[in-house]
Amino acid sequence: MSVKKKLFIETLGCAMNVRDSEHIIAELSQKENYEVTNIIEDADLILINTCSVREKPVHKLFSEVGTYEKAKKKGAKIGVCGCTASHLGSEVFKRAPYVDFVLGARNISKITTALNTPKFVSVDINHDESEYAFGDFRSSPYKSFVNIMIGCDKKCTYCIVPQTRGDEISIPKDIILKEVRKAASSGAKEIFLLGQNVNNYGKRFSGTHEKIDFSDLLNLISEVDGVERIRFTSPHPLHMDDKFLKEFSTNPKICKSMHMPLQSGSNEILKAMKRGYTKEWFLDRALKLREICSDVTISTDIIVAFPGESDRDFADTMSVVESIKFEQMFSFKYSSRPLTPAASMTNQVNSDIASRRLSTLQARHTEILDEIVKAQKNSIHEVYFEELRANSSVAGRTFNNFLVQTNGSEELLGKILKVKITDPKRMVLYGQII
């Protein structure tokens, strides 16, 4: 039996990148005899699967790749994949000439070709359905990430994703259901559906396929034997119609946590961002969700200091935060991305003002979070345990996405058990199994 080669892979960015990395691992394992290592010095191949949503991950790429070049063993190859690869293409070689190949986010199915072709570059965006068929690998035996669509049509003025991942294309339901059945039959109780705008699923396919919407897809997945929990990211506020909210609130297998990316609470800024909805629409959908699904948790994304944002615009964002009281918030200062309309807007906000606004927003959300967490004391949740932690403890998620940790061993992994919360903290709720 031949000796397996070693693969070191670093994944930056979103859950879709995590799933892409899983596909890469499977392809290299099945076709090139690789296995994963966590030791860079042992690796025959070093891959960085990149993110380009903000500027910071791009800088991190070239910092990391330089470190890897110094640490790698003689003869090892370095590849750059993902969204930054899509954006920069062969420019990566100019900035890091020791990189051996570059694969865009829509080209990872070509990983074996790239590995065996000197200075290979592929960043084209096409709609070939053969690219949906990958080898199978899951980084967790307890849940499975499943892509249901690729690309994005929204063209938000600050976002580079449509340029790196292409137009929005839905993956045919038969392919999705086949992957779900396979994951569930191998023990994955939780299915995590991925897409840039999942609740716009079914609007466009690359070929002739049965037209179904996201609500119908959720229903079909919930009927698969072995599936006990369904999560998804990210839905778009524009497509949160009543049918979708009803399916979300009434389907007993859909986890009651919703990500609603606000970005801004100002109608003027939302218009400049080309988000497609108003503050009023967002509030209506979020408050309706709270009404029909009392145990729901809502998370959000917020960008402060988008070009042209005034004090009043920022106050509008703060007012939405006060109204909805998000259980989780991912907030950032606006990051200018090349080739996006917002990058050329003349009314950029001073960086000191941006920093103050972000601090104000995050400080208030911390206060809100403290109130939310405090209310969890003595509550009882069903927790799906997925992770071993230090000091003989295990961690998992509640049905509405709180992270819970309790005393326990490996035998609890993969089980759903009731836990009483005894010591709630901001980042994790500590409890006891009952």
From Swiss-Prot:
Name of this protein: tRNA-2-methylthio-N(6)-dimethylallyladenosine synthase
Gene Ontology cellular component list: cytosol
Positions bound to [4Fe-4S] cluster 2: C152, C156, C159
Assembly and interaction partners: Monomer.
GO molecular function: 4 iron, 4 sulfur cluster binding; metal ion binding; N6-isopentenyladenosine methylthiotransferase activity
Reactions listed under catalytic activity: N(6)-dimethylallyladenosine(37) in tRNA + (sulfur carrier)-SH + AH2 + 2 S-adenosyl-L-methionine = 2-methylsulfanyl-N(6)-dimethylallyladenosine(37) in tRNA + (sulfur carrier)-H + 5'-deoxyadenosine + L-methionine + A + S-adenosyl-L-homocysteine + 2 H(+)
Coiled-coil spans in chain: none
Residues noted as binding [4Fe-4S] cluster 1 in the record, renumbered to the chain: C14, C51, C83
HAMAP family for this protein: tRNA_metthiotr_MiaB
Gene designation per UniProt: miaB
Pfam families assigned to the protein according to its UniProt record, in alphabetical order: Radical_SAM, TRAM, UPF0004
Radical SAM core domain span: 138-371
Residues annotated as domain TRAM: 374-434
Organism per entry: Campylobacter fetus subsp. fetus (strain 82-40)
Family as reported in the entry's similarity comment: Belongs to the methylthiotransferase family. MiaB subfamily.
Keywords: 4Fe-4S, Cytoplasm, Iron, Iron-sulfur, Metal-binding, S-adenosyl-L-methionine, Transferase, tRNA processing
